[in-house]
């Protein structure tokens, strides 16, 4: 009976009503459940009207024929109750026949079966994939300080032709080694690092910032930007070491992957601090708010910076989830077409797992319309990064070629951005 009551109700989709206003049964004043047979009624009056019409019942009022029907007395006078049903617009034409009820039941069952089949075929994030996502999220959070507090350890930014109040004035004591940051243990020397000879000791030792002057002059921002990039390299090494499967690679392949991808991952990560409002990277205070002019004062030109800003804008507009962002960084690092790799098949298998996880995550967790072609757009961003990487390499070589500039770079930069692949 409950099924028939549900299936013989017709919801009038053309009738709009305020959802905040209580819906009252037009027959007895009880709480209404919707439009039934063309009128707003409760379940009780709906069933009463349907039964009365099907039985073609004839009722007689034992009183004066004008009984006031309420929730409490609606069973006392069926005649006045039925009259009230008709008065508020309930129509027997809206009642389905037994054949119509059967057809509707079949349609509902068919729809439920189709929905169940569709749900069973919907991609689901496996336990293994979820574990991978969780590991990458933890790795990212351990190696990305959203407070940017370590930026105070860099050689200070010296900006030409800017308000002098924006410049940092700091005694040389800030360049001495202080207490390590919360996640610095990620980068300290470990048995694994010595076993594999991973880059040089500088990659795993506590990063020490040079006290080399931040005097105004040619490429005045280069010392600060060099420290920022070196710091970012340290963080990305820590992130890469925690990618599932990365440590399964031989040391030479780990080094080759990082040397080839690190600038691309820096560009990816920097998108978190990029603002569409003023096209700048804000890393905490105003002193660490970087615009294109700042990077030109570190030796780079618009051949790199114009497409870089375009890349940052496009990536920001994708509105990636943090899960998608960390997976994209891992996919970028684990690229089997990097130069100097010995076991490309293993790198490819790790990247395939990451890519599959990203596609599944998008299907399961990223609602439309944002998910439309999202995976393809993200992969295109990796292709854009290759072009940016190539241009960065050209400009870096020009900067590092001159001794007066290369002396402002860090040993880590000189090692990582060298053309030598082990």
UniProtKB/Swiss-Prot annotation:
Report the InterPro entries cross-referenced here: DBD_VDR, NHR-like_dom_sf, Nucl_hrmn_rcpt_lig-bd, Nuclear_hormone_rcpt_NR1, Nuclear_hrmn_rcpt, VitD_rcpt, Znf_hrmn_rcpt, Znf_NHR/GATA
Q: What is this protein called?
A: Vitamin D3 receptor
Q: Where is this region: Hinge?
A: 98-127
Name the species this protein comes from: Xenopus laevis (African clawed frog)
Asked whether the UniProt record includes Cell membrane among its keywords, one would answer: no
- Where is calcitriol annotated to bind? 232, 269, 273, 300, 392
Native organism taxonomy: Eukaryota, Metazoa, Chordata, Craniata, Vertebrata
Q: Where is this motif: 9aaTAD?
A: 411-419
Where does this protein have coiled-coil stretches?
none
Q: Which UniProt keywords apply?
A: Cytoplasm, DNA-binding, Metal-binding, Nucleus, Receptor, Transcription, Transcription regulation, Zinc, Zinc-finger
